[in-house]
């Protein structure tokens, strides 16, 4: 499933979420594609890449990145039995610089989240993600 991206503060971001497991989810892979508005220097992507790699390393989430065609591709694997926010990356780009933040709390249940310490039914999760405007395949 993926969330449709729109340019917001100079960045367009999409998230493709793959739920692994037949009926009960045992891990999740997320592919984030980050596209920078053409008015910004392409070096910003390198700055974002470095910040993203450090942020996910600090959270002990397996992360690989690559830059291609003016896009940053971030592949994440969530495998530990804990709670995660899957669309947790908040990036703001301006003429003054770049701000990269990882959202840690979802007090209002507005993000695509999962708790791998619980038995998650794939169909129930997909219904929940559709409500949050994700496109599910």
Show the residue positions of the predicted features.
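Subset-of-secretome marker
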Residues: 1-137
């Amino acid at each position: 499933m993926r969330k449709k991206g729109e340019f917001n503060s100079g960045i367009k971001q999409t998230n493709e979420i793959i739920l692994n497991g037949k009926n009960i989810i045992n891990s999740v892979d997320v592919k984030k594609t980050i596209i920078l508005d053409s008015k910004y220097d392409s070096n910003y992507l390198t700055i974002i890449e470095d910040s993203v790699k450090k942020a996910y390393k600090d959270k002990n989430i397996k992360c690989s990145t690559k830059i291609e065609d003016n896009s940053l591709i971030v592949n994440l694997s969530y495998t530990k039995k804990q709670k995660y926010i899957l669309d947790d990356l908040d990036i703001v780009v301006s003429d003054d610089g770049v701000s990269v933040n990882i959202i840690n709390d979802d007090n209002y249940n507005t993000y695509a989240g999962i708790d791998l310490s619980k038995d998650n039914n794939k169909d129930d999760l997909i219904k929940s993600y559709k409500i949050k405007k994700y496109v599910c395949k």
